[in-house]
Every structure is written in structure tokens, then in C-alpha cells.
Amino acid sequence: MIKQRTLKNIIRATGVGLHSGEKVYLTLKPAPVDTGIVFVRADLDPVVQIPARAENVGETTMSTTLVNGDVKVDTVEHLLSAMAGLGIDNAYVELSASEVPIMDGSAGPFVFLIQSAGLEEQDAAKKFIRILREVTVEDGDKRATFVPFEGFKVSFEIDFDHPVFRDRTQSASVDFSSTSFVKEVSRARTFGFMSDIEYLRKHNLALGGSVENAIVVDADGVLNEDGLRYEDEFVKHKILDAIGDLYLLGNSLIGEFKGFKSGHALNNQLLRKLIEQTDAWEVVTFEDASTAPISYMRPVAAV
């Protein structure tokens, strides 16, 4: 049986919020079967919990924000991408502020944290959402689509009219039955244009942003001294973002996601449309792991 997974141990980290620039304390904790991923604003009295579900998404302007009443948690997508990539079904994410720390702008540090905590299998079957037919949403020339696929695959295309992008691959397709999320996707960093960052800072956004936690591009090229981690790091980061956004379904996917110039808003619209169309998907479990179209690494021991 493919079993649900949680963390073996509690683990903590500190970072800054990308938009607030505030110091944030992050604690990842194990959670019981069928809890899902739940964000906890531990700085509030009483504490407020926000389950990582598509219906709890509020703002999607610069990142994916979860809301519960007037309480919010910003920038959840990179951590959720790491949870999805490592097959974590159940965990509590405690925060001391309203934003998940940006770390280095990728999912890599979160992967390291989760692997350091160790993974523990639980005595219940892991639930997958299997896509049964195509579902699409569009906004102008932007598009996001689910199609049936025996496995989990994410295809993405970006289209930036800028010298840095024109010279590089702007499309990628990753089939996770043959490609490692940890090696090939998790280290791709978020990116931004210097002109946009200056504008955002004037409006009290991206206050924590720097070349330490993003790829910064100006008219001449990439400002980061170390350059890119992958030749196609820009589009790989969009894939990383999409994986995090898709995990707001609450379960791992069996199917393919295709994005063309899609972002957090369109990704969330697609999830909501899928959830509404109950004939387009089904929940499945696997008593025999060898029959599953998706396999996960064996739980790693805590480091």
C-alpha cells in the first residue's frame, strides 16, 4: 500500500518575508492522518489555522496567499512545492508572521528541512486525485489545463520579450516518473526585473527581495554574480510554483498540468474549476504500490 506521510521530527528555521522584509520563525511539525498541510499563525492569540486548500486562496497578485477571515499567510507556494515533491501529506506549518520566509527564493531549503526532519509513513492509504478528462481555463492569451496522464507531469511555457529570455529556453516539460523534483526543479529560484523591484519597494512590497533570494534581471542581463543554477531556471521556477499551487487540491495528482504564461491566479482558477466538475476527476488509493503510476522515494531517515 502507498501510505500517507508526515514528518518524523519537528524542525525549525528562520528567514525573512519577501514582501514584508520581516524576520519570520518557521516550525514544521508532524500531523495525524488526513490532516493535510495546515498553516498556523502562532503569533496570534488565539492561534489561527488555515488549511492549504484551493478554496482558502485569497490574493494571487505576487504570490499565493491563504486566508481565514482577516488572517492571511503569504507566499505559500515554494514550501508547498517541497511538500508535494517529497510526498508529505500531513504537516503543521507554524509561522511567527503573515508570510512564509523566502529563504533563497527556491524550494531547495525547504526540501533540506523536510529531509532533515525525516519522513514517516502513516497507517492509512495515500489519496491521489486522478484527472479523467481535460479541464482548461483561459485569460486573454494565458492558459492553464489539466489532461489525463498516467503519472505526474508538468509542462510550462513562458513568453518574455527580453534579451535574457529570448536567448534561453522558455518551455519545459517534466515527467516526474523519470525526473527528480529535488535535483531538477527544487533549486530553481524566483525571478524579477530590477525596474519592477524598484516599483514594488515604493509600494512597500519586495522589501526582503535581493540577489540572495531571487534572480534579478536588468536591461543588460542577470545581476546575480553566480549566474543561473539551471540553463532553463526561469521556466523551471514556474514549474516549481505550479507544483506548489496544484498541491492546494489537498492530494497528489495523477495527470498532467500544462501552463502557457500562467501564474498563481490562473492556477487557482483551474483548481476551482476542476473541483466543481466532479466528473473530471476521482480519488484513488493503491493497495499495491507496484500498480501505481507514481512512486515516491523511500522515507529518508532523519539527518
UniProtKB/Swiss-Prot annotation:
Question: EC annotation?
Answer: 3.5.1.108
User: Which cofactors are named for this entry?
Assistant: Zn(2+)
Name the Pfam families on file: LpxC (PF03331)
UniProt record, GO biological process: lipid A biosynthetic process
Tell me which UniProt keywords the record has, alphabetically.
Hydrolase, Lipid A biosynthesis, Lipid biosynthesis, Lipid metabolism, Metal-binding, Zinc
Reaction catalysed? a UDP-3-O-[(3R)-3-hydroxyacyl]-N-acetyl-alpha-D-glucosamine + H2O = a UDP-3-O-[(3R)-3-hydroxyacyl]-alpha-D-glucosamine + acetate
The Gene Ontology CC terms held by the record are:
membrane
Check the record and name the HAMAP family matching this protein.
LpxC (MF_00388)
Q: What is this protein called?
A: UDP-3-O-acyl-N-acetylglucosamine deacetylase
Report the source organism.
Answer: Pseudomonas fluorescens (strain SBW25)
Q: Which gene encodes it?
A: lpxC
